[in-house]
């Protein structure tokens, strides 16, 4: 994956997150600032997702800790092989919102 493909892929992920939260009537605000995407829930807790361009990684930080994901075999996986979408759903649950990401 080159740099342009990396940014395009992450932008699609961020669009998908916003769309899925909205479609499931989740009370959360999404904000993009450069390489950082922040989800702020009604209880004012946050999940922060950011691009790490030099490493071509996607990072997720929440109450559950920090996770780093690399693009492998068509999916974003952490070093344990856990999918980004599954970790994001778990993070949302830890912040008080049950979300199903497809």
From Swiss-Prot:
Keyword Metal-binding carried by entry: yes
Family: Belongs to the frataxin family.
Domain of life: Bacteria
Job description of the protein: Involved in iron-sulfur (Fe-S) cluster assembly. May act as a regulator of Fe-S biogenesis.
PROSITE patterns membership: FRATAXIN_1 (PS01344), FRATAXIN_2 (PS50810)
NCBIfam families found in the cross-reference section: FeS_CyaY
Keyword annotations of the record: Iron, Metal-binding
Cysteines paired by S-S bonds: none
Any GO MF annotation of the entry: ferric iron binding
Tagged with keyword Metal-binding: yes
GO biological process: iron-sulfur cluster assembly
Name the record gives this protein: Iron-sulfur cluster assembly protein CyaY
SUPFAM superfamilies (alphabetical): Frataxin/Nqo15-like
Cellular component terms (Gene Ontology): cytosol
CDD domains: Frataxin
Alphabetized InterPro entries for the sequence: CyaY (IPR047584), Frataxin/CyaY (IPR002908), Frataxin/CyaY_sf (IPR036524), Frataxin_CS (IPR020895)
Xref: Pfam families: Frataxin_Cyay
Species, as recorded: Mannheimia succiniciproducens (strain KCTC 0769BP / MBEL55E)
